[in-house]
Amino acid sequence: MPQDVDFHIPFPSRRSPDFERARADHLSWPRALGLIGTDAAAERHSRGGYADLAARFYPSATGADLDLGVDLMSWFFLFDDLFDGPRGEDPQETRKLTDAVAAALDGPLPTSAPPIAHGFADVWRRTCQGMSPAWRARSARHWRNYFSGYVDEAVSRHLNTPYDSAGHYLAMRRQTIGVQPTVDLAERSCHCEVPQRVFDSAVLFAMLQIATDTNLILNDIASLEKEEARGELNNMVFILMREHGWTRGRSIAHMQDGVRTRLEQFLLLEACLPKVYDTFELTAQERESAEKYRMDGVRSVIRGSYDWHRSSGRYAADYAIAASYQGYLEELGSTL
């Protein structure tokens, strides 16, 4: 993230006490699944700091629970990189790959499925362990929304019609930023489930949307130089400049104000949760699960994203340019 762009996040920084162990071993899983096959790929992946991201997203997780979070973060960004080239401008190829990956939500994959799909299948299998059928169905819906968002992005690029409305762009990016599947894993990592009636409440819905919007704003600021280097036009900064005729500086300031306003609303919504719990007559155990989700899921995905974006090497312009030379990325997504 550009060092002169700051955001006030009113939550303390947290990171799993098991972070160092997880970081030391974080390349083992993608290597074992064939997702990283060269030293250059390993070095590039390490620069992203995905173990750090997982340790901040799931600050109470340790051992195998944290490892699952680390593997999910590794998978997320390997998958996302597959769409930085021609595939990301071809809706048919994008749908072909996202369908191949999403098939893991329905059952075992054929051996011919691309490596990135087998990687997702492994993460999904472990994610579902110990979770109820209702939770698995809810999380699967979130994943399908995430995959469909990539097709929408590809259509925009293919038609060479970049978004000219921040509102329309937000609606699309709320899917592809991947916050909801990320927060779902917080329930799995703490071995708890938010009662569905609370999850469906207007208060929690609004809190999750704020968490999502904050993440995508932080991400667009952090990736600004990277996306500019590769000619990407669908970034909130560029969209605000086109939509309003603003300068880059004013667009960034508007995004900073947007985060501040949203987080003020978030704190007000948090204060409403005890009333929500009372309204739905939650048991002591259900209240504990909901509070774990708030602290170790929703709050941590906001603060953790901010801390990670400020330190990750993923968003340097040279990282983006180097991606075009990583031939292994095409192999990961090959559906031939």
UniProtKB/Swiss-Prot annotation:
Swiss-Prot/TrEMBL cofactor(s): Mg(2+)
User: Which cysteines are cross-linked by disulfides?
Assistant: none
Q: In which pathway does it act?
A: Antibiotic biosynthesis; neopentalenolactone biosynthesis
**Keywords from the named record:** Antibiotic biosynthesis, Lyase, Magnesium, Metal-binding
* InterPro entries membership: Isoprenoid_synthase_dom_sf, PentlnSyn, Terpene_cyclase-like_2
Q: Which residues bind Mg(2+) 1?
A: D80, D84
Report which reactions are catalysed by this protein. (2E,6E)-farnesyl diphosphate = pentalenene + diphosphate
Enzyme Commission (EC) number: 4.2.3.7
Molecular-function GO terms, alphabetical: metal ion binding; pentalenene synthase activity
Which residues make up the binding site for Mg(2+) 3?
A: N219, S223, E227
GO annotation terms (biological process): antibiotic biosynthetic process; lactone biosynthetic process
The UniProt annotation puts motif DDXXD motif at 80-84
Amino acids binding Mg(2+) 2: D80, D84
- Judging by the UniProt lineage, the source's domain of life is Bacteria
Enzyme category, top tier: lyase
What does the UniProt cofactor note say? Answer: Binds 3 Mg(2+) ions per subunit.
Record-stated family: Belongs to the terpene synthase family.
State the function annotated in the UniProt record: Catalyzes the cyclization of farnesyl diphosphate (FPP) to the tricyclic sesquiterpene pentalenene in the biosynthesis of neopentalenolactone antibiotic.
An additional note in the Swiss-Prot or TrEMBL entry is: S.avermitilis does not produce pentalenolactone itself in vivo but instead a group of new metabolites that are neopentalenolactone derivatives.
User: Domain comment, in the record's words?
Assistant: The Asp-Asp-Xaa-Xaa-Asp/Glu (DDXXD/E) motif is important for the catalytic activity, presumably through binding to Mg(2+).
Instruction: State whether it acts alone or in a complex, and with which partners, per the record.
Output: Monomer.
What this protein is called in its record is: Pentalenene synthase
Write the gene name. ptlA
